Amino acid sequence: MLVVQMPFSFPVAHFILFVFTVSTIFHIQQRLAKIQAMWELPEQIPVLASTSKALGPSQLRGIWTINAIGRLGNQMGEYATLYALAKMNGRPAFIPAQMHSTLAPIFRITLPVLHSTTASRIPWQNYHLNDWMEEKYRHIPGEYVRLTGYPCSWTFYHHLRHEILQEFTLHDHVREEAQKFLRGLQVNGSQPSTFVGVHVRRGDYVHVMPKVWKGVVADRRYLQQALDWFRARYSSPIFVVTSNGMAWCQENIDTSHSDVVFAGDGIEGSPAKDFALLTQCNHTIMTIGTFGIWAAYLAGGDTIYLANYTLPDSPFLKIFKPEAAFLPEWTGIAADLSPLLKH
């Protein structure tokens, strides 16, 4: 029997084409969904694109940050400690936006910023640090760690000194302004070859040290000894004094040698000018506080610091170790504690 095969009718052909098209689209969507899932991280672990270029694949696990508390010197210590400990533990480091706004206008820092909206989505593990390095800090557990405390000790980061100095390189305009000021100074009619930065911390410390910490701030006697130490070792040095108590300095620092200049503006809210002047000097005389410690660390050269400025039973010594704050090669001059003993 001859069977005649008739072609599909027009509506049937359209129906088959429709089914084929829908099936194809469905399978493509399924494949795309699988590919997208491979690239997406869970919601609580934000993707931070800025790390992909700076860090190798083996270092992209987790996020480490640190609290941004205190003024310039404190935040420099926090930055350097985060930089060193994150590297030591093989974790990527990010700084809070507040820290970036404090440091970035002055220094060429490189750590990426962790914005508050991103930080709020991360299940942080807070990890408190003492103000000195401990062996356990080499093995801090956790991928999402927020370091806390006021760390400012060379024991955390001195093995990375070159890198830390690079991080705290002044912007050109900040450095040039300081150098321009120093070039204009003279001692007895000639331009000096040795500049000694002097930082005198006063302000709140004048009351906080004796009342809270059983300690003292630098007095007239200490500063005279420190200046004479440099005068005995260098020919015609010039002393560039910065302070948040400049009126006291002008009354108590001996200027009879015509080698003392009162500089800077002492404005704690905008410390770049004072700090830059100190770091561009050859040597440093500091009193107390992290501002002076960092100025000396960046300047290099000889450093004189106020030593033993608390009573032996001071609660300050529970959170502060002098040997972890002052480099071994720095020279300490003991403070006069007699005002404390009178009370």
Curated annotation (Swiss-Prot):
Domain of life: Eukaryota
Main location: Golgi
Residues in compartment: Lumenal: 29-343
GO annotations of cellular component type: Golgi cisterna membrane
Enzyme Commission code: 2.4.1.69, 2.4.1.344
TM ranges: 15-28
Enzyme class at the top of the EC tree: transferase
Membrane topology field: Single-pass type II membrane protein
Glycosylation positions in this chain: N188, N282, N308
Pathway(s) this gene product operates in, as recorded in its UniProt entry: Protein modification; protein glycosylation
Stretches assigned to the Cytoplasmic side: 1-14
Alphabetic keyword roster: Glycoprotein, Glycosyltransferase, Golgi apparatus, Lipid metabolism, Membrane, Signal-anchor, Transferase, Transmembrane, Transmembrane helix
Pfam families: Glyco_transf_11
Single GO term (MF): alpha-(1,2)-fucosyltransferase activity
Biological process, per Gene Ontology: carbohydrate metabolic process; fucosylation; glycolipid metabolic process; protein glycosylation; regulation of cell adhesion; regulation of endothelial cell proliferation
Location within or outside the cell: Golgi apparatus, Golgi stack membrane
Function: Catalyzes the transfer of L-fucose, from a guanosine diphosphate-beta-L-fucose, to the terminal galactose on both O- and N-linked glycans chains of cell surface glycoproteins and glycolipids and the resulting epitope regulates several processes such as cell-cell interaction including host-microbe interaction, cell surface expression and cell proliferation. Preferentially fucosylates gangliosides GA1 and GM1 in the antrum, cecum and colon and in the female reproductive organs.
Family per record: Belongs to the glycosyltransferase 11 family.
Protein name: Galactoside alpha-(1,2)-fucosyltransferase 2
Species whose genome carries this gene: Pongo pygmaeus
